[in-house]
Amino acid sequence: MKLLLDTHIFLWLISGDEHLPLEMRDAILNLDNAVYLSVVSYWEIVVKYQLGKLPLPQPPELFIPIQRVQHQIELLVLDEVSVLQLPHLPSLHRDPFDRMLICQALAHDLVFITVDSQVMAYQSDKFIIFGNSN
């Protein structure tokens, strides 16, 4: 499978947070799966860090790439194909970061890993969203 991590899932994974459901952790750590973190998540993390809403042990420009490499997570760039999904996406969720992550999952046939109930409203046959947190 090709997995796209929602921002909170990436943060839970790298911090060892117990909110990360076991089935998600197992899927992410399964070496048969390709795991991606979107540049959109980088952007979200940097914005929240700058606003003082997300403490990190190092500045995000150092911390995120190190954690991504240590956890064998590939970077997913934002491309035109993904952005052009946006006009076709129902307005079920107001968060622009989540909306663009959903577009990337749809555009690239990725399994989107999240526990965000608002994102789950977008569930379709093109990608799967795992269930609830512990």
Locate each region found by the language model.
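Acidic, PIN/NYN-like endoribonuclease modules and their adjacent C-terminal/linker elements
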Residues: 100-134
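Short, well-structured N-terminal submotif of metal-dependent ribonuclease cores
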Residues: 1-38, 51-66, 108, 117, ...
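Alpha-helix capping/helix-boundary segments
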Residues: 9, 41, 82, 101, ...
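Acidic catalytic patch
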Residues: 64-91
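Generic structural signal for small/hydrophobic residues in well-ordered secondary structure
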Residues: 7-8, 45, 86, 105
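General small-molecule cofactor/ligand-binding pocket signal
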Residues: 36, 76, 128-130
